[in-house]
Amino acid sequence: MSLLLWSNILILITAIVCLVVVYWYFKDSPKDIKATYLFALFLVLAIQVLIIADLAFVELIVEVLYIAILTFVYIILLQSIRHLKSEHYRYPYPFVFTPVFLLITYPFLYDINVLKEVIINLIEGGGIAVIIFLFVYHINAFKRKYLAYSGLLSFILAMILASFLSQKWIYADFLWPVFLSFGMILVTYSFTYLLRSSANK
């Protein structure tokens, strides 16, 4: 089994685990966040299936789906931040859909590879930074804080390995999918716990 195929299968299995976690543990949480989260995970599944199937035009389709995933991640974060605020301080609900502009502007960057990669890295880093802020700000709500911290650390390590070390270190391409998988599962569990605990207050 090639390294690329192994990483795709690992992320595919991870996405299925996360789907189960979100479906079962989001029962008392806001339905809009649950629906958006599930849809984003279905897109992750779709990407892995397309890569494994090695269909025609798969690169373009995967790239568009990945931008869609990043868009939905930001929508989830904005929905969650709004939900965790007291009612008097919540911004208007339509504001949570502003990340859709990522999808709208993407075609203008499609042919500019260097700029596109930089922007995608910034978007990924920004998403992780928002999750860190969200978890740190609400850290007392977590029963198992070490799971939240471990998930965040795994995400950061996966991003560093994939973005900066994949061409320089022979083990980077093996390790980043492992850290990404741990990060996805732990952050998903911690995220659902945070929203469930806030819903029960």
What function would you assign to each model-found segment?
Residues 131-201:
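C-terminal transmembrane-bundle signature of multipass membrane proteins
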Residues 49-58, 104-116, 160-171:
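Juxtamembrane "helix-exit" motif on the non-cytosolic side of transmembrane helices
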Residues 27-41, 86-97, 141-152, 200-201:
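Membrane-interfacial loop-to-transmembrane alpha-helix junctions, especially the N-terminal start
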Residues 8-22, 32-55, 63-71, 148-166:
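Hydrophobic alpha-helical transmembrane segments of multi-pass membrane proteins
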Residues 77-133:
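Membrane-proximal helix-loop-helix units in multi-pass membrane proteins
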Residues 57-66, 114-124, 170-180:
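Non-cytosolic membrane-interface motifs at loop->transmembrane helix junctions
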Residues 1-18, 107-124, 173-174:
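Hydrophobic transmembrane alpha-helical segments in integral membrane proteins
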Residues 17-27, 50-95, 132-136, 191-195:
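Internal transmembrane alpha-helix with an interfacial aromatic "cap," most often the third helix
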